[in-house]
């Protein structure tokens, strides 16, 4: 079995953290859709929101 690269480890950790957060919120009775953005997509979305709100 090949070892994971640092980038793969980081992505795997992010996905696991997101799943754990979602499970924790469900236990508290809060249901929300799973967010599956890549880092690049998230940064693009942040820029879009900043340009909208920083007038």
UniProtKB/Swiss-Prot annotation:
<dbReference type="InterPro" id="IPR022541">
    <property type="entry name" value="YhfG"/>
</dbReference>
<protein>
    <recommendedName>
        <fullName>Uncharacterized protein YhfG</fullName>
    </recommendedName>
</protein>
<dbReference type="Pfam" id="PF10832">
    <property type="entry name" value="YhfG"/>
</dbReference>
